[in-house]
């Protein structure tokens, strides 16, 4: 499921109107409508996290639906890649 459809489904399950949801996020309803209809890419990380919080869902699930790693995991993955490359090349 794409991010917009995922969030719309969760929002509707909670009985939250789209205009009210956008207002809670501090963005225009028109912009959020475009996100839910997949006319816009998923929003910035802070909006994904805030949307998950409002909906009471795991933020990691929302990031996965947005085809992104959560910010803390990005750093960890980067560190692992650097460590692997150092070990593979014998770099100290």
Where are these regions (language model features)?
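A short, Lys/Arg-rich alpha-helix, primarily the initiator
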Residues: 1-13
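Residues within the helices of the helix-turn-helix
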Residues: 8, 19, 49
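The alpha-helix within a helix-turn-helix
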Residues: 11, 22, 52
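Short alpha-helical DNA-recognition segment
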Residues: 15-34
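DNA major-groove recognition helix of helix-turn-helix
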Residues: 36, 47, 66
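Short, basic-rich loop-to-helix N-cap that marks the start of a DNA-contacting helix
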Residues: 39-53
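Short, charged recognition helix plus adjacent turn
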Residues: 61-92
């Amino acid at each position: 499921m794409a991010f917009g459809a995922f969030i719309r489904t969760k929002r509707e399950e909670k009985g939250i109107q789209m205009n009210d949801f956008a207002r809670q996020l501090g963005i225009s309803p028109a912009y959020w409508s475009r996100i839910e209809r997949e006319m816009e890419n998923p929003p910035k990380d802070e909006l994904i996290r805030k949307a998950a919080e409002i909906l009471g869902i795991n933020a990691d699930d929302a990031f996965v639906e947005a085809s992104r790693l959560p910010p803390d995991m990005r750093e960890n993955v980067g560190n692992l890649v650097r460590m692997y490359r150092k070990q593979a090349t014998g770099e100290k």
